[in-house]
C-alpha cells in the first residue's frame, strides 16, 4: 500500500488560520479523506459517529473544536456573542459524545476551570479565547511528547522482563483495537510501544539475545478498528504482522507456544506471544481499566496460560501433555490523563452502548476483481429484528493486569498485596 506521512496524521490543526480537520477513519483503509470541524456540534457528531476515535485523539479534537468555535464568536458583534454560561453548556454537551473516555471529560473540565475567573454573563472575549487556545495547543504538544515517552518506557519494561525471564530468540506481541497515530496526536500508546520496540529490537539490530518478530492485531469486532486501522499503520511502518479474528486468540497463543510441536502459521511466524499490549479509555484508582470491548477477554486468556503449565491435547492414540508458554505479560499503555482517581473501581465506570446495526451489518466499499474501490455499501449479516447487546467497552480487573505504562519513567506494577498505587 503506497502512502504518505500525512495519511497517518489523524488531526490537522492550522495554528495560524484556526482551522481544524480530522481524518475520517470510517473511510480507512481505502480512502484518505479529511473533514472540516468548524464547531463544537461538528466535533460532537464526529466523535459520536467514530470518525475520530481513541481517547487521546478525542480529547484533542474536543479541545480544538472549542478553540475554533470561540474564534468564530470573536468575529461576531458584541451583541451577538455568546456568554460564558452558553460556552459551559456547550462543553457539558460535548462531554456526552463519548462518556466512557475520561480524556475528553478531563480536557473540557480543564477548560471549564479556566472559565471560572469570569462571570456567567460575561461575553466571550479575546482573553478567554487566548487561554483556551494556549491550553489546546499544550494538550496536543504534550500528548505527542508523552506518547514517545510511553514508547520508550514500554520498551525498557519489555527488555527488563525478557532479561529477567532469561528469554532468548524471537517473540511476538498481540494487541487490540487501534492505539497508534490514528488514535492520538502521533506515535501512539500501545502501538507506540510496539513501534519503539520494533525499532530497537529487530533481529538485525537488536543488542539483546531476543528480538521482536511479529505482531498479531485482533480484528476488533464489531467496528473492526484492528482490521481497518492498526493493520493500516503496521503496513505503513513495514512492521511484520498477521491479522487475526478476536476468537482466534487462544488457539494462536497455544499454537505458537507449543515448544514440542510448533506449527507455524506462516514461514518464520513461530515466535511465542510474550506480551499483550492494550490501550485504555479510563483507568480508575485501583487499576481497573476500561478499554475496547474484547480487552477483558484477552486478559482472561493471558491469565489462563500464565496459570496452566500444561494443556491436554487429544491425539488419535492417546492424550498428551503439551508444555505451553506461561509468561505472557498483560500491559496497559496510556497517558496519565487517562487515570481517573475520582473513580474507585471499574464497577463505577459508565459503559457506552452502541447501536444494534453496528453488530448486525457490515459497512465498506465494494471492491472489484482488480481491487479498485467502488461505492460504499451496507450489508446485513444477522437475522433482522433480533435482540442485540453492543457495549463499546469492557472493564479489565486490575488483578489481570501486570503493568500500566505511562509517560512516567516509573512503570506501575502491583505490590505484594496485588494492588496498584496510582496516586499521582
Curated annotation (Swiss-Prot):
EC assignment: 5.3.1.23
Highest taxon above the source species: Eukaryota
Annotated pathway: Amino-acid biosynthesis; L-methionine biosynthesis via salvage pathway; L-methionine from S-methyl-5-thio-alpha-D-ribose 1-phosphate: step 1/6
Annotated active site: 281 (proton donor)
Amino-acid biosynthesis among keywords: yes
Free-text function comment from the UniProt entry: Catalyzes the interconversion of methylthioribose-1-phosphate (MTR-1-P) into methylthioribulose-1-phosphate (MTRu-1-P).
Protein name (record): Methylthioribose-1-phosphate isomerase
